[in-house]
Each structure stands twice: as C-alpha cells, then as structure tokens.
C-alpha cells in the first residue's frame, strides 16, 4: 500500500500495534508522537524513519533531539508539535491513538486538512463529538473508527443506504474482570485485580475503565456522536467471549453482527485499508471451536460509571466533557493507590454537581468544563 500515516500516540498499546500493522502492510510513517517515552520512540524512529517525531514533554524532546541528531527526523515538542504531526503534508491518514482530551485539538486540525482520521481516541467524540463530526462534514474528512466495537458498527453499516433504517446499535462488553460481583465484593478489589482483563491486552487507563464499565459508557456516547443517534437507539450488552464485537438492529427485524478474534490489529488494519481489506496474518476465528456465545444485561447499580455516562449522554452539553475529565483524574488516583475503585464514580458525581450548563458550547467551553471537573476531583483528593 502507498498510504502514509501520522501516528499520534506511538508508544501506547494501540500505537505499538499500529506500527506492527504498518510494518505488515508496508505503510510509510510520516510522523510519530508520544508523551515522554524517549527510548521507545527513538527505536521506532530509527526503524520507520519519520520526517517528524514529537515528544510532548520538552525535556524528553530535548534528549530525543540529541539522540536523533544524525538522522533526517525533526524533533518537536508540546501541543505545537502534535499539531504539526496532525497536519503533516506527507501523511494522508492520521491515527489518533493518544489517550485523553489532549487528542482533541490535533484531531480537529487534521480534519481541517481533510485527512482520513483513524480514530482510536474516544475522548475526542465523547467530549466534542458534535464539533468533530460537523467539522468532518464541513471539510470532507473521513473518520474511520479503530475501537473494536465502533469498527464493528462501521463495517455492519457499509450496506446501509438509509440511516433511518437503523433501529438500534448494540455495543458488546466483556464485563471486565469484575463481572457478576456485588457492590460489597467490588469495593475490596485492588489495582492489580482491576488490571487483569479477561480478553484484551490494553493500556492501564482503558483497562480500569473496562473494569468500571466506564469504557462502555464512553463508547455509547461515541456511537451517538459518530452516527448522530439518540441514547434510546444505542445500547450495550455483556458478552463475555468478546467474539461478537457489536451489532446493528434494523427496523425490519434483521440484525447484522461483526465477529472476530479479540485482536486489536484487526480493526486497526481495516482502518488503514478501508474500503479495501488486506490479507491478515492473524489467526482466523474458527467457528467450530468457538465457545457458546452469551449475552446479558449490565448491572448499572454495581457499575455506576455506566449509569453516570448514560445520564451525561442524555443531558449532553458540556457534561460529557466534565465526566470524562473527572474520570481521568479519578482513574489516575486509583492507579496511584490513593483511592478504592468504588470512589471513582463518587468523584465523578462530585465534579458533575459543580458543572454548569453552557448554551451552545464551543471548544473553549468544552475545555473549560474539562479543566474545572479535574480541579474538583483534585481538591477532593487533597
């Protein structure tokens, strides 16, 4: 393939797997970005020879600049560097694999340059979905989701000529490591317990979100924004086997599902090659060896983060951004062993109680809601 990518977040789980796919497909890499992982991005830059490498942390960027001084790779830092990578003229596809709100501005900048967006940064759509989708339509940019669930929905809708035919999008959810526990049992679970996802290998933050089911809440909001559907048309079910990645139900009673092994390189590869499909070295799904496929309703009283996310989805406005910011701060505190897992929804609710509705919110309002929510959580922690 001749596609050239700018990879935002190259040292995280999705970023590393994206480079594996790039290697398999023979893609060129125009830009790499990370936070401050000097050693890993140096290795990546030496292999893929990007024109641009970015470390958000200035001290780390200074060290990388010295290490790559005898190469043709330019090293930048900060948001300026991220924006340069996202708008690189020699990249036709921007893979947004960074975690959190930091991916929002680079994504919007890439959209204005009419890039294909391979979207793995769910916070972009959760916090500013209407702005992002409106911008993509305005500039003619293509958004291809990388999340396994949204990739599944995207694939199921390829033959759908009229979105009015959709009755429901159904996102599947493994249930995480704590499926079936009571609230009392959940309260004593530790960080080590929460990081043991039954089916997927992911980064720490998204693994904790999967344990609290916040990840599914974020994905419900993401689907609402991406396909412009109300909450009543987007649902989630527990599917422990992670074989059915999501389903679309149509008004005529038909239901389409996308099945596959739980391997993130499959949706990454599809986002790189769409509308075509490339031969994959991955082990194919063997239907004769599949376990029985089961589906169940999530327990929103135990996993309150899912309930909170749905409430914010129904309200809209800046509440999704506030919820996301508060969740990021609370999860970070949990990963530092400062709070228990059941304190995460408590902190999110405390931040939402302080959030005020903004009439027709703009990007600045969304960023401010995120900032204030984080501030509330930090004050509670102190």
Residues covered by each model-derived region:
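Catalytic, metal-anchored helix/loop core of enzyme active sites in primary metabolism
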Residues: 1-382
């Amino acid at each position: 393939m001749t596609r050239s990518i700018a990879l935002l977040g190259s040292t995280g789980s999705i970023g590393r797997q994206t480079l594996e796919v790039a290697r398999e497909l023979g893609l060129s890499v125009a830009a790499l970005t990370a936070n401050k992982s000097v050693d890993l991005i140096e290795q990546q830059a030496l292999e893929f020879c990007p024109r641009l490498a970015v470390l958000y942390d200035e001290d780390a960027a200074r060290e990388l600049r010295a290490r790559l001084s005898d190469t043709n790779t330019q090293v930048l830092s900060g948001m300026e560097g991220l924006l340069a990578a996202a708008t690189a003229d020699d990249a036709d596809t921007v893979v947004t694999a960074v975690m959190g709100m930091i991916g929002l501005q680079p994504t919007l900048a890439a959209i204005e340059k009419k890039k294909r967006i391979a979207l793995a940064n769910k916070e972009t759509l959760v916090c500013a979905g209407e702005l992002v989708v409106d911008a993509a339509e305005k500039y003619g940019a293509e958004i291809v989701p990388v999340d396994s669930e949204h990739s599944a929905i995207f694939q199921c809708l390829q033959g759908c000529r009229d979105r009015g035919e959709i009755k429901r999008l159904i996102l599947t959810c493994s249930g995480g490591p704590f499926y079936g526990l009571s609230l009392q049992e959940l309260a004593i679970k530790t960080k080590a317990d929460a990081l043991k996802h039954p089916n997927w290998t992911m980064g720490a933050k998204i693994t904790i979100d999967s344990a609290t089911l916040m990840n599914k809440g974020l994905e419900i909001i993401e689907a609402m924004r991406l396909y412009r559907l109300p909450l009543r048309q987007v649902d989630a079910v527990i599917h422990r086997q992670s074989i059915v990645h999501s389903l679309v139900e149509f008004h005529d009673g038909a239901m389409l599902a996308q099945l596959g092994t739980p391997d993130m390189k499959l949706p990454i590869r599809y986002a790189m090659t769409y509308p075509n499909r490339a031969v994959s070295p991955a082990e194919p799904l063997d239907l004769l060896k599949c376990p029985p496929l089961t589906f169940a309703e999530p327990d929103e009283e135990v996993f309150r983060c899912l309930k909170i996310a749905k409430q914010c989805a129904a309200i809209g406005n800046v509440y999704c951004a506030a919820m996301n910011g508060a969740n990021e701060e609370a999860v970070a505190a949990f990963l530092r062993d400062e709070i228990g897992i059941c304190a995460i929804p408590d902190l999110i609710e405390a931040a939402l109680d302080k959030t005020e509705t903004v009439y027709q919110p703009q990007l600045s309002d969304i960023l401010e809601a995120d900032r204030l929510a984080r501030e509330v959580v930090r004050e509670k922690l102190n």
